[in-house]
């Protein structure tokens, strides 16, 4: 076990930069960003130069254009221009000296090479990418061969010079360097596999990736709320990417250089948490059904930090170790919707959002070492075993656990041996 850990740590060091993170910070929001999330918005303003100094360019090309919005020009408008103007006003409310919509969308693709728009971009100290559909971002900010347009090249140059980039939902997903998830549900990914063309609930991804600002693993959003643990692990396994990051709603993963340490450091900001999955020591099952074992998962919440070069986790002060203080003798009743299925929905959406987190948190506050979670779909039934890691210290609310995945026939009552 120790030798295996040393070997895998050496692999990690070979994959990641060993020097400081030279570009500007990244603020990766998992979607569902509330207007009153002071922690995230104020951090964006601070990193862009501070109150009265920050100049933020707002990019909402992931939204539908004005020409496709039946409510354009009304208070119900939800198009690129309306969303851009809304975010610009909100950012100025939080202290930006200036915030401007960058007028590039499906109605105005040619603006990605307009010298005036490029000059506008060059005057900014930070950028905010709104949500929607990341395919619209590739259509509007990249060329037909997926090269940078002049506008994206200018954004990249500003970022390399220190400008902060923030994104939410699709605006976060597009930041990834490697394979980019484009759709799908956890159950479907585990049951049917991975595709390169989006269709319904199929797990799909773009092999060419996103804009390449985040190079530490896969990225996913709306994570715990939509039970996306299964889909990101399946995609990471399929694409042979050793790490995957899932950001919850109204929550951000801040990625920036720690000058004192001389290396990149990630910090969780906001309401919920961020999952980090480590697949370096994964093992595939040998049976006829898909099975994956020894995936390590960590769940960090506000103030917790992760240093990817060394693999070190730093738990925020004020959080207390649960070891020896567990309140329960048994974990919660086995859930029948571990991945918060959209097929189990009511008037307010998914009936059991964040179910994976609830099950895991309950496990760590108990004196047992493992629990099971079942999927809502039963043909076939999929079970998940969540286990406490035998070595690492559990924390609340920064839980860490070992996770096993397998898709089993409905009549099975255990994992493949």
UniProtKB/Swiss-Prot annotation:
GO molecular function: peptidyl-dipeptidase activity; serine-type peptidase activity
Keywords for this protein: Hydrolase, Protease, Secreted, Serine protease, Signal
Principal place of residence: secreted
Chemical reaction(s) catalysed: [L-4-(L-arginin-2-N-yl)aspartate](n) + H2O = [L-4-(L-arginin-2-N-yl)aspartate](n-1) + L-4-(L-arginin-2-N-yl)aspartate
Xref: InterPro entries: Class_I_gatase-like, Peptidase_S51, Peptidase_S51_cyanophycinase
Family matches, as Pfam families: Peptidase_S51 (PF03575)
Primary enzyme class: hydrolase
Gene Ontology CC: one annotated term: extracellular region
Annotated compartments: Secreted
Function summary: Exopeptidase that catalyzes the hydrolytic cleavage of multi-L-arginyl-poly-L-aspartic acid (cyanophycin; a water-insoluble reserve polymer) into aspartate-arginine dipeptides.
Protein name: Cyanophycinase
Taxonomic source organism: Pseudomonas anguilliseptica
